[in-house]
């Protein structure tokens, strides 16, 4: 008896299979027990659907090639084996070649074609992103967060989902289901050479997270073959990650794939630990519609011998399914796919105005509330105002947790910005991470998706760069590219700025880079009261927020920054984003020229100290948030005083401040008596550690006074 017959016998003798009704035009999970014969017929219907769609897309390439796409041809067996077994409480992150996973969970060909043709009713993105880039939030389907094109990008967010599941279980706020949820991350083998994928594996192994990694290995990158791009395959590579069990299988054998997936899912649901399936498969179609297989491959004939559809057809024959029944299935599928394609072509396209929907989720915080300066309190340093804000939030909200490098019990942050929190709330809610900025940032996508509010920290702004890939590709775009389904509710704390001989790797300002990432909000407070109020607002805002916290203001140790210490606001104090603060009012009645200084962060104190040298001629506006920006307040002040300095700690050229100056010039041109001046650091690659050199590079009060004098005389 051959292997497939042996498996069939085992199935018939007692291994019941939870399966689906394969009326392909509707969601097919009916949660009923069925025979292996019915399972195989159902799988064949779906697998033939995937092939028919691939063939149709090729036949109609004059239409379908308008938007780039890839299909699962050759990968169908393992993908269907996975998709058909997932439950509504599960999360799955398919990648761009995984349309068979989508068919397996119940997405119809028509819905997939709406995305292929970028139609308005594309259920995933409303015509905003590519074919087989799903995002799904339906009650009776497995959930799918926004998926991007960057190889391996889904590994960190999906591992964040698993981390969130475990956290909720550990502190008792999960749904307490009989069958616990799992996270599934699908990857191509070539993507596993990405460093961020290793960060995800590291955390899954370290924390023993309930996640299944499915790695589909077709031995191709695009045109690069396996021997060009990897030192070992994923099975060998995973030997370095203690705690992730790996199964290696023939991913073209549906029965073996189904059994393996079933067993792995059972283990993860029950034992809550990570597993990886390494499925070896052929790529039978093009890399994408724009990179055709015949251009560079010489293995196509050999790969065709491992076609999973042919193997499944043979298994049906071995299991006594008549050819006439199979042919009937094929005819039904062909008619359905053709009809769905014709209907999808006729579907409505998005309107131009649809492009502006879902850039940000609506925020509940629209006005300042609470007591900013309660009676009977003494001034509190800025770092403690942040600490107290987070403490109050964690006391009130079990979904709040804090993690990052060195924020845990022993240290509480290198600036003591998280001191006492781990002791008070426990090391499940406040914990250290490895040195993995990408994971720290990107995991918040998954944590947010399961209903948590992660507050995370990058230790210095200088070290945010490894996290920018996740911030830009996943965090900032999730709400927009999921067409409003998946906002990422998170706070990213970033200690920033120079604080006295910090040197080139502990003094940087990075706000201009961040301000060019659309879809995130950016706060940059200059006082303890503002830091606490904005931290609270950030928590209740459903969008991602970057909180830039100036290290030189944390303790007010730098001369002239004493005013950063403020009375700590009460627990209910909140400040809406996009509302600037007037630090110094100027209403000159003596006919002297006046000017306004628009600034933020440390610039508030350079400006405040410089203004003392002038007799009621300076108005100072503290932006407080850089995105959104309070343009109305800025323009109002500039139009009142007719002269303006935009003051920043960053180098001037190509900076946020220079961009703001251009906006001021454009909107206030008729009111200006002088060019808008930008004052900032010198345009050099880094801030030197030597104090003499540092002083030369950075702006300060004395340099600002000179610029003010010149502008007032203009």
Labelled PLM ranges:
Residues 144-342, 346, 515-642, 646-647:
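Glycine-rich ThDP/TPP pyrophosphate-binding loop and its adjacent helix/strand module
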Residues 80-88, 159-170, 202-210, 239-240, ...:
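Alpha-helix C-terminal capping segments
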Residues 67-75, 96-97, 134-155, 249-254, ...:
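Active-site nucleophile and cofactor-binding loops and adjacent substrate-binding regions
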Residues 59-64, 128-148, 178-184, 242-246, ...:
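Glycine/charged-rich beta-loop-alpha catalytic/anionic-binding loops adjacent to active sites
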Residues 1-78, 84-86, 279-425, 435, ...:
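Conserved acidic/glycine
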């Amino acid at each position: 008896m051959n292997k497939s017959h042996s498996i069939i016998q085992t199935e018939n003798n007692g291994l019941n299979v939870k399966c689906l009704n394969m009326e392909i035009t509707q969601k097919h999970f009916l949660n009923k027990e069925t025979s292996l014969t019915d399972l195989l017929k159902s799988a064949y219907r779906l697998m033939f659907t995937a092939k028919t769609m691939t063939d149709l897309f090729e036949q109609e390439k004059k239409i379908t090639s308008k938007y780039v796409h890839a299909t699962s041809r050759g990968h169908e067996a393992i993908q269907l084996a996975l998709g058909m077994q997932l439950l509504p409480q599960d999360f799955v992150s398919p990648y761009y070649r995984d349309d068979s996973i989508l068919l397996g969970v119940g997405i119809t060909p028509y819905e997939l074609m709406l995305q292929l043709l970028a139609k308005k009713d594309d259920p995933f993105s409303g015509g905003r992103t590519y074919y087989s880039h799903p995002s799904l939030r339906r009650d009776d389907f497995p959930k799918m967060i926004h998926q991007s094109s960057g190889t391996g990008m889904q590994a960190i967010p999906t591992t964040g989902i698993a981390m969130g599941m475990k956290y909720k279980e550990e502190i008792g706020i999960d749904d307490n289901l009989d069958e616990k949820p799992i996270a599934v991350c699908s990857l191509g083998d070539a993507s596993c050479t990405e460093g961020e994928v290793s960060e995800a594996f590291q955390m899954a192994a370290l924390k023993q997270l309930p996640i299944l990694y499915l790695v589909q290995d077709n031995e191709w990158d695009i045109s690069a073959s396996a021997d060009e791009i990897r030192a070992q395959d994923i099975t060998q590579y995973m030997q370095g990650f203690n705690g992730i069990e790996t199964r290696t299988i023939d991913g073209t054998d549906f029965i073996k794939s189904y059994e393996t997936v079933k067993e792995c899912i059972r283990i993860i649901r029950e034992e809550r630990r990570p597993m990886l399936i390494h499925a070896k498969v052929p790529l039978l179609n093009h890399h994408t519609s724009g990179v055709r297989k015949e251009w560079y491959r010489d293995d196509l004939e050999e790969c065709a011998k491992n076609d999973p559809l042919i193997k499944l057809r043979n298994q049906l024959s071995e299991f006594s399914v008549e050819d006439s029944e199979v042919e009937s299935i094929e005819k039904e599928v062909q008619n359905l796919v053709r009809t769905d394609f014709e209907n999808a072509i006729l579907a409505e396209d998005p309107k131009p105005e649809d492009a502006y929907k879902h850039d940000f989720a609506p925020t509940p915080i629209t006005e300042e509330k609470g007591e900013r300066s309660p009676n009977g309190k003494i001034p509190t340093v800025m770092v403690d105002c942040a600490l107290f804000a987070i403490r109050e939030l964690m006391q009130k909200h079990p979904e709040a947790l804090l993690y990052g490098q060195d924020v845990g019990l022993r240290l509480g942050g290198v600036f003591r910005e998280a001191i006492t929190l781990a002791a008070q709330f426990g090391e499940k809610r406040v914990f250290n991470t490895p040195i993995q900025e990408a994971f720290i940032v990107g995991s918040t996508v998954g944590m947010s998706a399961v209903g948590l509010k992660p507050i995370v920290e990058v230790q210095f702004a200088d070290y945010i760069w490894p996290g920018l890939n996740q911030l830009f590709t996943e965090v900032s775009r999730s709400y927009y590219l999921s067409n409003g389904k998946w906002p990422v509710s998170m706070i990213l704390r970033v200690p920033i700025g120079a604080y006295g001989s910090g040197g080139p790797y502990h003094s940087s300002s990075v706000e201009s880079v961040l301000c060019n990432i659309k879809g995130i909000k950016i706060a940059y407070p200059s006082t303890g009261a503002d830091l606490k109020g904005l931290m609270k607002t950030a928590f209740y805002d459903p969008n991602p927020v970057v909180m830039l916290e100036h290290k030189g203001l944390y303790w007010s140790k730098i001369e002239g920054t004493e005013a950063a210490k403020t009375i700590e606001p009460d627990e209910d104090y909140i400040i809406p984003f996009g509302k600037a603060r007037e630090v110094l009012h100027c209403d000159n009645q003596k006919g002297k020229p006046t000017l306004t200084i628009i600034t933020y962060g440390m610039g508030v104190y350079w400006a405040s100290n410089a203004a003392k040298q002038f007799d009621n001629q300076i108005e100072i506006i503290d932006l407080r948030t850089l995105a959104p920006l309070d343009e109305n307040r800025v323009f109002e002040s500039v139009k009142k005083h007719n002269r303006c300095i935009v003051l920043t700690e960053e180098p001037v050229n190509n900076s946020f401040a220079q961009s703001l100056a251009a906006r001021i010039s454009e909107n206030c041109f008729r009111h200006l008596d002088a060019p808008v001046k930008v004052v900032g650091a010198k345009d050099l690659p880094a801030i030197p550690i030597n104090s003499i050199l540092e002083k030369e590079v950075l702006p300060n009060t004395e340099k600002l006074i000179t610029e003010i004098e010149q502008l007032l005389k203009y």
